[in-house]
Amino acid sequence: MYRSVLALLFASVLLLSGCAVGQQTVPKEKSGQETNMDGAAFDRSDEEITYMDTKDNVIYLAGGCFWGMEQLMQSIPGVIDAESGYANGTCEADADYKTVCKGETGFRETVRVEYDPEQVSLDALLMAYFYVIDPTAQNRQGNDRGSQYQTGVYFTNESARETVKRIAEIERGRSEKFFVEIGPLKNFYPAEEYHQNYLEKNPGGYCHIPRAEMELFSRLRI
């Protein structure tokens, strides 16, 4: 039902817009952190932090396999750049695909999203994000299993913190379980070159996000 409501919301947005298309060191964390059944321990939004990315209009989104999330974000008008990488793990030496896939580094497959707020808001990007993920799933999305596929939204400034907290609180109230990590970005390392723009290079490649949903958001303007 909620997805239907969101679809109607985006359809309304499209009509209104004329369907225009327009490092820091961190302590080692356990990748299998225990949580309450409602996922409450995943909220770290009130942590004291020193931001590592000084750009205002950047958000980091972990939404399962980064191929699909990168492609989704790139399809949204107003997104300047989307880069696949590994976030909030142990150290740079562990930030490679083979090591991360072992599930022992704490790294999440994450997409760094830089956007133009004159064309698209952070609210809109987060709405698109929550539309395509399953927030009730821990350490998995689609057919992918492992701590590297844990969902999360990682902010880099105070303004984004408040927006993320507000949207996350709304989403948290929609189900009994909510396992999306909410907190500051601690580190981020770009993924290997062959992961960048993977679905653009391999149009028939695996993606846990339906193509129809990407097409929907390619006409998004808020």
Feature locations, PLM:
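Flexible coil/turn and secondary-structure edge motifs
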Residues: Y2, C19-I222
